[in-house]
Amino acid sequence: MNSAPAIQKLLDELERLPGVGPKSAQRMAYWILNTDRATALRLAQSIIEVKDTVHFCSRCFNYAEGDVCEICASTKRDGGIICVVSEPRDIPPIERTGVFGGVYHVLGGALSPLEGIGPDDLHVAELMARLGSEDVGEVVLATNPNVEGETTASYLARLIKPLGVKVTRLASGLPVGGDLEFADEVTLGRALEARREL
């Protein structure tokens, strides 16, 4: 796109978004240019509003507009079960299942010695404080099934188990509709280990 300076500035900013390359940025820029002014302003205002009003929940570190997030504030949630996730973006997929009725704790990342991320860089101390002050019977470790997530889950399990709190890990295995021939050995091994009686 042979761009005016304002268009080039928009393209440069759009390309900074995760997963957006030059072509996607160009499509978005064209859409913004071709849409009516009111729609473009609503988009801009939404971005400003979310940056001005959304912050971290003081209890679980999920996104919130008030002091605590809607999940922590709900009287319908079971505060005795805490699901530990790495990032706030991990909560919506779990919520969409409609299966989990407890509350969450967001670590703000995962342990990664290679990247210099240790326990003090995450919300581990805050989790331990919650376990000491709230009546929690179970902690579900829902970190990602990668090296960092497994390391984080193992570390947390070692910290939490001595408190007498039940520690569980999300089962990992084969996706529904998947074929065995395409499953990697680790996934298939975990599926076998987490098998259940019918």
Where are these regions (language model features)?
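Catalytic cores of large soluble enzymes that bind and process phosphate-bearing ligands
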Residues: 2, 35, 39, 115-119, ...
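Conserved, well-folded catalytic cores of nucleic-acid-processing
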Residues: 13, 17, 35, 50-53, ...
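Extended interfacial segments that mediate partner engagement and assembly in macromolecular machines
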Residues: 25, 74-143
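Long C-terminal interaction/binding lobes of large macromolecular proteins
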Residues: 128-140, 144-198
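Solvent-exposed alpha-helical segments within well-ordered globular domains of core cellular machineries
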Residues: 8-12, 26-30, 41, 45, ...
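Residue-level signal for pocket-adjacent positions within structured domains
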Residues: 27-28, 42, 55, 67, ...
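Cys/His-rich Zn2+-binding cysteine-cluster or related metal-binding knuckle/ribbon modules and their
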Residues: 2-8, 16, 26-91
